[in-house]
UniProtKB/Swiss-Prot annotation:
Protein name: 6-hydroxytryprostatin B O-methyltransferase
Entry-linked PROSITE patterns: SAM_OMT_II
Organism, scientific name: Aspergillus fumigatus (strain ATCC MYA-4609 / CBS 101355 / FGSC A1100 / Af293) (Neosartorya fumigata)
InterPro entries named among the record's database cross-references: COMT-like (IPR016461), O_MeTrfase_dom (IPR001077), SAM-dependent_MTases_sf (IPR029063), WH-like_DNA-bd_sf (IPR036388), WH_DNA-bd_sf (IPR036390)
Binding site for S-adenosyl-L-methionine: 201
Pfam family, one: Methyltransf_2
Keywords: Methyltransferase, S-adenosyl-L-methionine, Transferase, Virulence
Record-level Gene Ontology MF annotations: O-methyltransferase activity
Catalytic activity: 6-hydroxytryprostatin B + S-adenosyl-L-methionine = tryprostatin A + S-adenosyl-L-homocysteine + H(+)
Entry EC no(s): 2.1.1.293
Length: 342
């Protein structure tokens, strides 16, 4: 109950857009604040909510009882990317969790994306299934932008680990599949300037990438749907934070499309979270990874995977793929797994 009240109250203030209407310096009385909100709310009720959330660090009051920012809530004014991620989580990260039980009743496997928690949250009234995560975002440009902005923040905090996650000196040509606008490719090629990298993603993303003025000459961009056959021949193929967005059946399709391009000696590189065995590693680390696993389920009907699950998924797709090693860079939440095609 305690955490539900904490999360639910902060979520409500975010969705009411209260932090957006509080000045970054100074304060604003409750009567004036409610007049700025798009959704009507009684000043006394809003005061009750804020006087609770201030105790957990979200918003605050001055000596006269007017509303002012706390360091946490000020992010919504001075850090748009992080704020977008928080707004996205308020809409999509929390609400689907209340549909987990109903989803299990409809789909005990947890693999059916149209009967997953988010799909049930977004479905038409009375329907037994709903849209997938990506279909929801396709019709919601505001949250689609928040999602991509949030991923940019997330990637910026993790991308520094990529250059040290693998011996890139052994790779001459690399295909970064689902590589977005090339931010990961840039980190690799800046550290290893001999590598030629092809970044593949959907047309909308590739178009944005090509418009950027800071493109490295060793990076080219190519439109590609990873559910279709891989058109490029290369030394290595890289899937970073891709497979955890998809269920086992879809991951099998993705890997098999890459397999069609593999030649002896080529490598498949996957960088994703790897679930530990219970009690393996620190409690904090395991909690973080298992929270991510449940998050993948609620949003995508997907999962984080253990090493055994990842190996089984990949090696069942192509018997030529021999597992080489797993390496987790210090401080990284994701691990690099490598296979060589024999």
């Amino acid at each position: 109950m305690t955490q539900a009240v904490d999360i639910g109250t902060i979520q409500t203030l975010i969705r009411l857009e209260v932090p957006d209407q509080v000045p970054l310096t100074g304060s604003i009385p409750y009567d004036a604040l409610v007049k700025k909100l798009k959704t009507p709310v009684d000043p006394e009720l809003l005061q009750r909510l804020i006087r609770f959330t201030r105790l957990v660090g979200f918003l605050d009051e001055d000596a006269e009882g007017a509303v002012k920012h706390s360091p946490m809530s000020a992010i919504f004014v001075n850090d748009p990317d992080t704020a977008g991620q928080a707004r996205f989580m308020a809409d999509f990260g929390i609400r689907p969790c209340s549909f987990i039980y109903e989803s299990i009743k409809l789909d005990p496997s947890g693999e059916a994306a149209r009967q997953g928690p988010l799909a049930l949250m977004a479905r038409e009234p009375g329907a037994r299934e709903g849209p997938t995560f990506f279909e929801v975002l396709e019709k919601d440009p505001v949250n689609r932008k928040r999602w991509h902005d949030g991923m940019a923040v997330h990637n910026d905090s993790m991308v520094r680990h990529v250059a040290g996650a693998y011996d890139w000196g052994t790779v001459q040509s690399l295909v970064d599949i689902g590589g977005s606008e090339g931010h990961v490719a840039a980190v690799i090629v800046n550290a290893f300037p001999h590598i030629q990298i092809t970044v593949q993603d959907l047309p909308e993303i590739i178009e944005k990438a090509r418009q950027r003025g800071d493109r490295h000459p060793n990076i080219i961009f190519e439109e590609h749907d990873f559910f279709t056959p891989q058109p490029r021949i290369a030394d290595a193929y890289f899937l970073r934070l891709i497979l955890h967005d998809w269920n086992d059946a879809d991951c099998t399709r993705i890997v098999r499309q890459i397999s069609s391009a593999l030649r002896p000696g080529a490598r498949l590189l996957i960088m994703d979270a790897v679930l530990p065995e219970p009690g393996e590693g620190s409690l904090q680390s395991e909690r973080r990874l298992r929270r991510s696993d449940i998050g993948m389920y609620t949003l995508f009907s997907a999962k984080e995977r253990s090493l055994a699950q990842m190996r089984r998924l990949v090696e069942d797709c192509d018997s030529r793929l021999r597992f080489e090693k797993l390496y987790t860079p210090p401080g990284s939440h994701a691990s690099m797994l490598s296979w060589i095609c024999e």
